[in-house]
Amino acid sequence: MMKQRTIATPVKTVGIGLHSGRKVTISIKPAPVNSGVQFIRVDTPERSVVPATALAVCDTRLASVIQKDGVRVSTVEHLLSACAGLGLDNLLIELDGEEVPIMDGSAASFLFLIESAGIAEQEVPRQFVVIKKPVEVREGDKLARLEPFFGFKLDFTIDFKHPAVDKTGQRFVVDFSEHAYRSEIGRARTFGFAHEVEALREMGLARGGSLDNAIVLDEHRILNNEELRYEDEFVRHKILDAIGDLYLIGHPIVGAYVAEKSGHALNNALLRKLLEDPSSYEISTFAENKAPGAYSQESQPLFF
């Protein structure tokens, strides 16, 4: 039977919040079986616990933000994407501020941090959300869909009218029975446009944003001196975000995700619509030799 997993030993690091610009200490610790991923705001008097769930999402304008009883944790998607990529089910994540640090703008720092701590199997079967019928949400020309598929595959199309993005590719498909998260997705950085960054800073946001943690573009080109990590890094980062957003369902998904110009808001709307219809999914466990290829040792060696 495939088993639940947590981090083997506690690990800690310090980073900067993308929007607040404030230094944040983050500690990732083992958690009991069936507890899921829970954030703990150690800077609040009650050490408030905020579960990482789809129904806890309260804001999706610039990142995925979750809250409970008015206590917020923002920009959770990159860390949750790393948790999904490493096959982690149960974690306690302590923060001394509201925002998960941006690190280098990808999931790479979180992958390294968790791998350095090690991963421990727990003696309880791992649960999966198996998609039983298509579920789709649309907003204008944007869409996000989950459909039955015995594995985990993402097909994402972006549409940015910019020379640098046009040149690198607007669509990417990744099937995790054939590609590993760490090598194909985990290093893709967030990106933004210089004029948008200026506008955000005037609003008191993006104070921690820099060329060290984002790909920044002006009207014609990429401003970073560093080359792209993937030739189609922009769309791969959108997949990284989507994996983190989808992990708010609480379990790994067995199904296919298709998106056109989707973002945090539509991804969360998709999960909420899925949860509203119990006939659209089921919670299952798998014997190791019966598990989807996307979650097997051969295709995802980091899981083991």
Swiss-Prot record:
Annotated S-S bridges: none
Gene3D superfamilies in UniProt: lpxc deacetylase, domain 1, lpxc deacetylase, domain 2
Residue numbers binding Zn(2+): H78, H237, D241
Cofactor(s) required for function per UniProt: Zn(2+)
Catalytic reaction equation(s): a UDP-3-O-[(3R)-3-hydroxyacyl]-N-acetyl-alpha-D-glucosamine + H2O = a UDP-3-O-[(3R)-3-hydroxyacyl]-alpha-D-glucosamine + acetate
Biological or metabolic pathway of the protein: Glycolipid biosynthesis; lipid IV(A) biosynthesis; lipid IV(A) from (3R)-3-hydroxytetradecanoyl-[acyl-carrier-protein] and UDP-N-acetyl-alpha-D-glucosamine: step 2/6
Record's GO cellular component terms: membrane
Its EC number(s): 3.5.1.108
Pfam families for this protein: LpxC
Single GO molecular function: UDP-3-O-acyl-N-acetylglucosamine deacetylase activity
Keyword set includes Lipid metabolism: yes
InterPro entries recorded: Ribosomal_Su5_D2-typ_SF, UDP-acyl_GlcNac_deAcase, UDP-acyl_GlcNac_deAcase_C, UDP-acyl_N-AcGlcN_deAcase_N
Function noted in UniProt: Catalyzes the hydrolysis of UDP-3-O-myristoyl-N-acetylglucosamine to form UDP-3-O-myristoylglucosamine and acetate, the committed step in lipid A biosynthesis.
Family affiliation: Belongs to the LpxC family.
Descriptive protein name: UDP-3-O-acyl-N-acetylglucosamine deacetylase
The species this protein was found in: Polynucleobacter necessarius subsp. necessarius (strain STIR1)
Phylogenetic classification of the source organism: Bacteria, Pseudomonadati, Pseudomonadota, Betaproteobacteria, Burkholderiales
Gene transcribed to yield this protein: lpxC
